[in-house]
Amino acid sequence: MNILIFGPPGSGKSTQARRITERYGLTYIASGDIIRAEIKARTPLGIEMERYLSRGDLIPDTIVNTLIISKLRRVRENFIMDGYPRTPEQVITLENYLYDHGIKLDVAIDIYITKEESVRRISGRRICSKCGAVYHVEFNPPKVPGKCDICGGELIQRPDDRPEIVEKRYDIYSKNMEPIIKFYQKQGIYVRIDGHGSIDEVWERIRPLLDYIYNQENRR
């Protein structure tokens, strides 16, 4: 089973993608994780990507395509791809690769939330500057404001989590996804999921669909 999952900033797509990975035994390919690993390693590519993200801009397609296709070559089948493709150019690159290697996508899941909800979820996020633990001022606050429960490190807001940057990211995402959504609708594999509510509530909107696809494939 090969899945695409996407959604605006704060939609919870990565949380749901990890649940899907565990339930169906898929390989998790997350563009965000791959990009953050490059940034953390302070590679020349990572430093360049960090500049784009700090401004709320999308990373150029040529860079993202190179990173994702390199990962996909090592996986081939039974994957869930999180956060890719996000532009028409990325769709073309992915579709060409899948066609050349005889790989079929089963479903493209779009977890939708409003811009207001996106800002509320993302701008309240805080990261420990020492250990990387994640908190939220509303949903998961630390015991001591501004301090990590685990190591006592200072909690910071990532530059791309500021409200004005989140709004810009949401607008860019929505604009770029319009043709992508239309493409996968024409392919007959697009499914929009309401991303509002708890993690479990959203999961129960996704699970029956994937159980059906998984069972159908196993009957072949």
UniProtKB/Swiss-Prot annotation:
It comes from the Archaea. It catalyses: AMP + ATP = 2 ADP. The keyword Nucleotidyltransferase does not apply. GO terms for biological process: AMP salvage. SUPFAM superfamilies: P-loop containing nucleoside triphosphate hydrolases. This is Adenylate kinase. CDD domains: ADK. Its main location: cytoplasm. Pathway: Purine metabolism; AMP biosynthesis via salvage pathway; AMP from ADP: step 1/1.
